[in-house]
């Protein structure tokens, strides 16, 4: 076990350029996960191939010598198919046909099949093959048939460590990975009066429109708040009137419920009234003023009338 651990450590400590496919095949999932955790990765992949790819991408980030990213993609476990041999076929055309099609010097008149400004040896390269025309009217066709493995581009997983975060992307082709590595290696120079100036100019009228809309919204909201205040005051007045009416009704109901108390108070008032009249007459006689008997009889009549009204209300 110790020998295996030491070999794994020695393999992982090698620089990325010195790693071979044999070294990568000797690595295990646990070795890769342990290495990634030691480097600060929180959740390494449980898949062996993905963990190895994460180790290779991490080593490429820590080793600034290889900025192109080709070392990472070269170590992907997906083996690329070998380039198939090119099949070359030689087609011989008769000279008579070439002469009939205008294989003549440029100084002569234009013919039916004459080509202007065409060099004697023309070369055309395309995706399917390569065509060459020589002096001796020979055409060499170089055909490179594509295998089904080539049509499906090699796709792998890409891990990016940036600002303390780990981002893992699946299905990244090699060309895209190279472009990302080039983009990360080159610094970005932003012009002073470039894109940001235009964005500022665009943002200014937007802010003015917002400043114009805000006062209108405030003016629309002000009368609504005033109307709500007026309605609130009216509701308060109505509720106050209801409260006062209920209070009056409670007072009248209390007086009707206790007739004995009212009658006793009336009796006490009637008993006290003759004494008050006598004292009042003595005061008047002492001062020298006298009242007519009509005035003396009016005061008890007034009190009796009040008592009679109270008795009628109680009944």
Swiss-Prot record:
Map out region (Disordered) in residue numbers: 113-145, 248-315
Q: Where is the composition biased (Basic residues)?
A: 248-257
Tell me one GO biological process term. Answer: regulation of leaf morphogenesis
Per its record, how is this protein called by name?
Protein TIFY 4B
Purpose: Regulates the arrest of dispersed meristematic cells during lamina development.
User: Biased-composition ranges for Polar residues?
Assistant: 293-315
Q: Cite the PANTHER family for this sequence.
A: PROTEIN TIFY 4A-RELATED, PROTEIN TIFY 4A-RELATED-RELATED
**For the motif Nuclear localization signal, what are the positions?**
235-242
> What else is on record for this protein?
Redundant with TIFY 4B/PPD2.
Q: Which family does it belong to?
A: Belongs to the TIFY/JAZ family.
Assembly and interactions? Answer: Interacts with AFPH2/NINJA.
Per UniProt, subcellular location reads as: Nucleus
Cite the Tify domain residue spans from the record. Answer: 151-186
Q: Which species is listed as the source?
A: Arabidopsis thaliana
Q: Which GO terms describe its cellular component?
A: nucleus
InterPro entries linked to this entry:
CCT_CS (IPR018467), TIFY/JAZ (IPR040390), Tify_dom (IPR010399)
Give the knockout phenotype. Plants lacking both TIFY4A and TIFY4B have larger leaves and cotyledon laminae, a dome-shaped leaf curvature and shortened siliques.
